[in-house]
Curated annotation (Swiss-Prot):
Record EC number: 2.3.1.31
Taxonomic lineage from the root: Bacteria, Bacillati, Bacillota, Clostridia, Eubacteriales
Alphabetic keyword roster: Acyltransferase, Amino-acid biosynthesis, Cytoplasm, Methionine biosynthesis, Transferase
Family: Belongs to the MetA family.
Main localisation: cytoplasm
Organism: Clostridium beijerinckii (strain ATCC 51743 / NCIMB 8052)
Residues noted as binding substrate in the record, renumbered to the chain: K163, S192, R249
Catalytically driven reaction(s): L-homoserine + acetyl-CoA = O-acetyl-L-homoserine + CoA
KW Amino-acid biosynthesis (keyword) present: yes
Name by which UniProt lists this protein: Homoserine O-acetyltransferase
Amino acid sequence: MPIKIPIELPAFQVLSDENIFVMNNERANTQDIRPLKIAILNLMPKKIVTENQLLRYLSNTPLQVEVSLIQTKSYTSHNTPPEHLNKFYSYFDDIKQEKFDGLIITGAPVEQMAFEEVTYWKELTEIMEWSKTHVFSTFYICWGAQAGLYYHYDIPKYDLDEKMFGVFSHWVNDEKADLTRGLDDVFYAPHSRHTEVKREDIEKVSNLEILSESEEAGVFIVATKDRRNVFVTGHMEYDRNTLMDEYIRDKEKGDEIALPKNYFRNDDINQKPLYTWRGPASIVFGNWLNYCVYQNTPFDLNTL
């Protein structure tokens, strides 16, 4: 089944051109099923890029998904056209009376700041608190995962000596876990962060399970036992060229940044980046939608 998004949203044409099944509202309304209501709190600077990335994976399942895009009121994006935000995004106040099957909270380039120093931290904590009663399962990405672990469980983040930047190998800790079902014994995923969470802090919380980790990148996928909260410390949604774009951006700013690891063939930036995480990303997003959301969310969201 397809993802349901407005036909004017840039992602509609992007995904259609990639032969991904998308559906506009008119066609979706003729189907006699209830779509999954998924909200995306998009904290990334280039919001249209992130929309395309996430919607690509949300559309790659047999489930019909209805997406609501959310922006913060306490901080206005400077990298996305205002007309796009006005047309396709809502503020939290606009949707807080609704209930959702799922919520995705993206990463944000603020991990070197203390959580409380982030401009929209208070608003984000209100959304995370609201999600306890209005969302069946929440999927936190990168800094969003660190923020969620800190808010819900007081798990701190730690500065890294150098940026975790590149594509790293990971393993699955529990082969029978629903969220990692279908992943190979070793799989790859991108990371792009200056901070980390530590296994020993997570292990102190009895309700949390570490489902996947990496020798080099550390803890990767963490989830509550009931799967109402899922935390992914990397960026499985990234496109082939995202790490390259970030590298070029940082070099142009004059930052000291090493080439992303395990990304360019022979570490040659003139070579096409190796796209080694598309399959694992599809599996993890699909498993979240199916096992963590669809199989358990109530048909009547008012009973949530």
